[in-house]
Amino acid sequence: MGFLPKLLLLASFFPAGQASWGVSSPQDVQGVKGSCLLIPCIFSFPADVEVPDGITAIWYYDYSGQRQVVSHSADPKLVEARFRGRTEFMGNPEHRVCNLLLKDLQPEDSGSYNFRFEISEVNRWSDVKGTLVTVTEEPRVPTIASPVELLEGTEVDFNCSTPYVCLQEQVRLQWQGQDPARSVTFNSQKFEPTGVGHLETLHMAMSWQDHGRILRCQLSVANHRAQSEIHLQVKYAPKGVKILLSPSGRNILPGELVTLTCQVNSSYPAVSSIKWLKDGVRLQTKTGVLHLPQAAWSDAGVYTCQAENGVGSLVSPPISLHIFMAEVQVSPAGPILENQTVTLVCNTPNEAPSDLRYSWYKNHVLLEDAHSHTLRLHLATRADTGFYFCEVQNVHGSERSGPVSVVVNHPPLTPVLTAFLETQAGLVGILHCSVVSEPLATLVLSHGGHILASTSGDSDHSPRFSGTSGPNSLRLEIRDLEETDSGEYKCSATNSLGNATSTLDFHANAARLLISPAAEVVEGQAVTLSCRSGLSPTPDARFSWYLNGALLHEGPGSSLLLPAASSTDAGSYHCRARDGHSASGPSSPAVLTVLYPPRQPTFTTRLDLDAAGAGAGRRGLLLCRVDSDPPARLQLLHKDRVVATSLPSGGGCSTCGGCSPRMKVTKAPNLLRVEIHNPLLEEEGLYLCEASNALGNASTSATFNGQATVLAIAPSHTLQEGTEANLTCNVSREAAGSPANFSWFRNGVLWAQGPLETVTLLPVARTDAALYACRILTEAGAQLSTPVLLSVLYPPDRPKLSALLDMGQGHMALFICTVDSRPLALLALFHGEHLLATSLGPQVPSHGRFQAKAEANSLKLEVRELGLGDSGSYRCEATNVLGSSNTSLFFQVRGAWVQVSPSPELQEGQAVVLSCQVHTGVPEGTSYRWYRDGQPLQESTSATLRFAAITLTQAGAYHCQAQAPGSATTSLAAPISLHVSYAPRHVTLTTLMDTGPGRLGLLLCRVDSDPPAQLRLLHGDRLVASTLQGVGGPEGSSPRLHVAVAPNTLRLEIHGAMLEDEGVYICEASNTLGQASASADFDAQAVNVQVWPGATVREGQLVNLTCLVWTTHPAQLTYTWYQDGQQRLDAHSIPLPNVTVRDATSYRCGVGPPGRAPRLSRPITLDVLYAPRNLRLTYLLESHGGQLALVLCTVDSRPPAQLALSHAGRLLASSTAASVPNTLRLELRGPQPRDEGFYSCSARSPLGQANTSLELRLEGVRVILAPEAAVPEGAPITVTCADPAAHAPTLYTWYHNGRWLQEGPAASLSFLVATRAHAGAYSCQAQDAQGTRSSRPAALQVLYAPQDAVLSSFRDSRARSMAVIQCTVDSEPPAELALSHDGKVLATSSGVHSLASGTGHVQVARNALRLQVQDVPAGDDTYVCTAQNLLGSISTIGRLQVEGARVVAEPGLDVPEGAALNLSCRLLGGPGPVGNSTFAWFWNDRRLHAEPVPTLAFTHVARAQAGMYHCLAELPTGAAASAPVMLRVLYPPKTPTMMVFVEPEGGLRGILDCRVDSEPLASLTLHLGSRLVASSQPQGAPAEPHIHVLASPNALRVDIEALRPSDQGEYICSASNVLGSASTSTYFGVRALHRLHQFQQLLWVLGLLVGLLLLLLGLGACYTWRRRRVCKQSMGENSVEMAFQKETTQLIDPDAATCETSTCAPPLG
């Protein structure tokens, strides 16, 4: 309420015509610190008092004391300071209203406030009573007022009030704890002179659920809160009445105690009386518990109870009591004849549950197809005779009826007449006749019309005949058989219903069958069967052998050999013999017994609930069978303890070591059966069945679940939401009551764990509805209890009501109302207040516009031919026994809709028309607008939208908008979706393989199609799986294949993938619109290499590589091995008895059927470990300045060795984890003389160690280039030989690129003008009295601008449209090359290639650029090559001429040396050469000559003439160039050149180098005598550890370390190719070294003598002599070359190298 209305309301309290003086305001007003308050006030004065200048309104605080001015309408300055800005006069003196507003209240504001008004000096009035204001720090709690008695179904008001009111901010009262669906609140505020207050009223419809509810009223003011509460006591009739049945959760058996308890969930006041009813009849019991001491058939029925209190009563839902028992009734009751109908009925007491399942047994054998309570034997036959009983079963157990006998009378069947002969002498015959009949028949046995025996006593009295009889059985024994005893014997059977006869042809001369060595043999033993007969042996005699009555073999032999008898050979054998004239009778059967060890046992476990009758409880059955002969000893073990054996025992349970009396053991041959009554927890788990006899043993295992753990839910499995549920895990175990932990599972997922056997759900919520199970954790292997379903009941939630509009089918709407409730709710749909349909049935005719369909908690109403009158509010109400709720929506019928022709369901490419329809007639000029997925379609403005061939991208939601001319409103249609179907596309087939223990293969096929496609997965031509039938194929499904199907997805899992599963799989996808397919190769990795003892072994160890194959046909496979990609041998495994480093390589095996490509395994690498060897220690010195020395130690070791480097006994460095394996590097920066000396390196690994040492000498002489090492061409350069240790006189010798340049006393070389010829490597030697010292080479670089640019081109003869353009230049530093055409850059050497379209591959080298050009035009093209570096640039132009010619070689381009060769330049296309034509030839781009003839002839081609040739034809019409061709001249190897190098100090290392010249390349071999030492072919010779071979084209080098005596001798180097061969030989050994030493000693002696003579010649002659001696000494110390007829030996000093002439060999190292 606004402030002004409140003032007007306040002014209304002043009556008109008031004639007295006075002020009215509340007695007291309350406020809270920080808030505000209003003091309502009105005043009055006589009507005759004149008001000349208005009325002055004044409010005072503490009027009788301090009299502080609070508000002054005339002079605000008089207001007390503490009230300024916090008070506001809200009244209007003219209307005699004097309200005062106090803001930002403080506790100090408490006190009396008085109002005074002044009209004139005479007329003024003060209120002496005033208003008491109270301001507190905290608000007082609100006051709640409620009715005295609350009764269910009544409506009451609860009032909450507070004295606090503030106009500036809201003072809020709020009710809490009420049910919003059944309550409403409203508030009011009081501003009157009589008082101020705020009231909040709660109006509620009382329900029994409100009993005990706490209502709270909360006050919010000035950031403070306070609340009051009230507890409701609602009287109501009893609620939640139901009957609890005990026992529950299982079947109630006859004789058991049954208790029915009437439970009342809530009642206020308490229940006063209980009534019981059975089948609607009232019982005498008036207590809350009904006891049935011994349940009987008559106790079954429907029970209810009624609870009553002072308010009302309630009847419980009915509960059915069923006594779980059965009995069988047979009809007819008398004798039963064949072809009569017999009916057996399995009767149960009343109120039998509907979920009963019936089973029928005949002679204790289950009848598979009989599962109803009635068993009918139509046209009964003799086979129906037997004992019958029925079994009723539900989820809690089963119960069997007593057996009844059914006997079907019938006449005798055909008798069975058999004959036997005595097996040894054949003098006794036995005939046996048996028959089946009911009642028993009389049997008569006769021969030739003469009765020999009968069951009635008539028989032949001859002593040779003796007969015995039994029920339906007759036996006749004939002694001293005679020929007359042969013939036809007849057996007749007769009873009251008929008779039957059979005959037998008996032969007294029947054959006999003998078994050798015995009738009982062991499997695998040889057995001979012999057939003896009385027939004379003749050549045409034939013997027939029969096994179990079937012909087995026929032949001339009287013996049948079984070379290795098996269990399948066991059985009954007989034989026949015949010749050309007669035949013997069949022999008597002889039984062959084959003994064999136990096969795999069959072990099954089962649990029967109440299988043996009422109260029997649970019965566990463990059954173990085995196939063996002799019968096996069976033994059942549980947790390594023998439970039962098949051994005979003296009685009791001694065989199981003191078993429980609950356990019953049944034994039979090859069978062991154990029954456990009420199994305990300790008896659950894994059982092992072992079978053994004298020939072997076998075993198998199975898990037994005795349901020792049972989950019970109390009070019931079905509860109301908000009640309490107790879940108890009952465990039957030996240690009952001992502490245990329990695991709880909800819907199969672990839910909780703890020591409590009972879990309480309080309150029960609907989300608690689930399958619950439990398990005890104390016992290992304990089984889960049987899951129990908890159902939760709750009233309906608020329904969900939706409306769907279908504009394509006659303007139809579909209303769908769904709700969540349990039990199911009754749904009702209203239009306004008109009921349209309910879930019980439609309220309108279903054949009209309305069509209703109801499902569980769902109601659908279809409204056809919508009209504008169908718009409005629709309401759906849901009701069940627990409550009700409703919801509503407003439905608007649109003025327009979209019609689709032919249908919204379309195929891709189909024509479709969309029409925009409206309810009323369409006026002319109506405009239309179409939208797809909410976006306007600009191209269509007519009433129809057409698609000649719709595509997938055009699918979507379409709607239209129609607007009549001159109308401001539009008709908007609801969207309608177009669904476009299409054929399968984008088929993908993915294969994965997991090589873990399960070897799981996965094939996943996906496709994009609509409608979803049918997927078929084929392996070759075999169907493996499909989306229709899962795993399938002609041979049936395999248990290894698991199929998962989803829309457009087919997943195949192959468990235990094998070799046969590999190959190409095809996935075919098809729907009604088309098909597509994809294929993939599946690799099951079924072939693997197994290495024993492992993939990492030590050198010299035994290694075995086995090819493992997962396959079903291992015997039909062949094996192939590959070592480093090379095929090795065919075997299942490869033994390596003494593995070496050469074996450390990659291995793989291939497996496949003969004649087919093998399936290869994945390669596995064999890692061979060996001790450290080939330890090398080297050093390098920096070439410039010698400021860095590098010491490098390397070793060959596996595993990598630990390297340590030391100098003078001091460790300098060692390898770490971050070091390069088998390498140790030491850098000495600024080395000093003290760093010289011997360095040692040691290599150590777990397999061994090695050591080596090296002397380090620092370099003292170096070459200095001034001003720098790189100078421009033409600049001066000085090369200085710096030797700090030189002493005059010093002789300096200079070398350029390894060649001697000059020598003299000058230490420098000066070049005034540097040219490119000066570039290269410079080194020097300094020689003085101390000796000779050499420097390392220093490189001089002369820089110059690019020059000699050459642009050449040719066309590729292999591809007519491709040409090659090459640009080369000479420059230093290298130039940057660019190739352009028509001003566009095609390629550069800096890496920017293919800048223009049409360019091809680019090759870049130093100062060279090569470009392949594709699609070359027919005409000539001009190309520009530009070269540029820092010193300048150059460019050249070349033309890519049209290839109009081709070089033709006769006989070819590969020609033997000395043969004749003609190269012809042939023109392409057009006429041949004419007059004035010239042909120029080029060899390696060098012009040879020009001739008028197109042929270049070679009479005897030589190897020097090999190279590149092309021709240029200059014709009158223009020039034509050919592409170059390569000419190869072939020649046999010349005599090889063989060089031998021996280390001069000790001769411990040597090198043999053999080279040859040949074309094609030759194959080189090196022999020592007859031993092949090395070859240029791969794996040509087994290399020894100390011999290293290096092969290159036409060259073979052999390094021999630690030279042995066996390595010395005459070596022969042979070279051969297809044209011939050549060889040479030389001696290699220390013999040449000894000769060299002797020669050196001789040189020293001669040199000394010559030196003494030359001293006499003077200083000049001495100088000349000294030079010659130095050179000779250098040669003697460092290099001596001895040339013999067949050997060349060169020794080198590793610390120095010299060259006398340009022809000396370069130093090695």
Curated annotation (Swiss-Prot):
Q: Which residues are glycosylated?
A: 159, 265, 339, 499, 697, 726, 730, 741, 886, 1104, 1138, 1251, 1462, 1476
Q: Which UniProt keywords apply?
A: Cell adhesion, Cell membrane, Disulfide bond, Endocytosis, Glycoprotein, Immunoglobulin domain, Lectin, Membrane, Repeat, Secreted, Signal, Transmembrane, Transmembrane helix
- List the Cytoplasmic topological domains: 1663-1709
Q: Per the record, what ranges lie on the membrane's Extracellular side? A: 20-1641
Organism name: Homo sapiens (Human)
Endpoints of the signal sequence: 1-19
Disulfide bonds, paired cysteine numbers: 36-166, 41-98, 160-217, 262-305, 346-390, 433-491, 531-575, 624-689, 729-774, 817-876, 916-960, 1005-1067, 1107-1149, 1193-1241, 1281-1324, 1367-1425, 1465-1511, 1554-1613
Q: Does the keyword NAD apply?
A: no
Please state what the protein is called. Answer: Sialoadhesin
Gene symbol of the encoding locus: SIGLEC1
**PROSITE patterns linked to this entry:** IG_LIKE
Under the heading CDD domains, the entry gives:
Ig
Q: Tissue specificity, please?
A: Expressed by macrophages in various tissues. High levels are found in spleen, lymph node, perivascular macrophages in brain and lower levels in bone marrow, liver Kupffer cells and lamina propria of colon and lung. Also expressed by inflammatory macrophages in rheumatoid arthritis.
Q: What does this protein do?
A: Macrophage-restricted adhesion molecule that mediates sialic-acid dependent binding to lymphocytes, including granulocytes, monocytes, natural killer cells, B-cells and CD8 T-cells. Plays a crucial role in limiting bacterial dissemination by engaging sialylated bacteria to promote effective phagocytosis and antigen presentation for the adaptive immune response. Mediates the uptake of various enveloped viruses via sialic acid recognition and subsequently induces the formation of intracellular compartments filled with virions (VCCs). (Microbial infection) Facilitates viral cytoplasmic entry into activated dendritic cells via recognition of sialylated gangliosides pesent on viral membrane.
* Subunit text: Interacts with TYROBP. Interacts with CLEC10A.
Q: Which residues form the Ig-like V-type domain?
A: 20-136
| Gene3D superfamilies the record matches | Immunoglobulins (2.60.40.10)
Which residue ranges does UniProt annotate as crossing the membrane? 1642-1662
